[in-house]
């Protein structure tokens, strides 16, 4: 749908509307921050202007939560990926991911290992799907990924 605050050219308003209908039937969605903003009609630039604030991740969680809370949806878990953020306790910027599952919000971080790589979201989705088949909750799925398990 988009990345780094930019919507892909192929992502038309009609496709956006259809994507919103489609995700309402999913049990788990894994949008990056741009995609979350597109799905919720949120302003990416307006949100990311708070990236240096201690409550930045809370702001993102508040944007994501309503996707789970409507009667028209069956979404159980939202995993917002690829959030660049330097938490007050960090000495450097890291990639953060928010897992909204049941009534809990988990924050998972990983150092930046050389940059951004195409296909990592697809890999994450595969791990999430396999974990669901195994009956694991999503935080357990993250712990099975070596790049994250040492950071949890």
Show where each model-derived region lies.
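Conserved phosphate/ATP/ADP-binding segment of small-molecule kinases
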Residues: 8-105
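N-terminal glycine-rich phosphate/adenylate-binding segment common to multiple enzyme folds
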Residues: 1-5
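Short Gly/Pro-enriched loop/turn and capping motifs at secondary-structure junctions
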Residues: 85, 133, 149
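Short amphipathic beta-strand/extended segments with alternating polar/hydrophobic composition
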Residues: 104-113
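Residues on a specific face of well-ordered alpha-helices
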Residues: 17-20, 24, 126, 130, ...
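Short active-site-adjacent structural elements
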Residues: 87-89, 117, 151-152
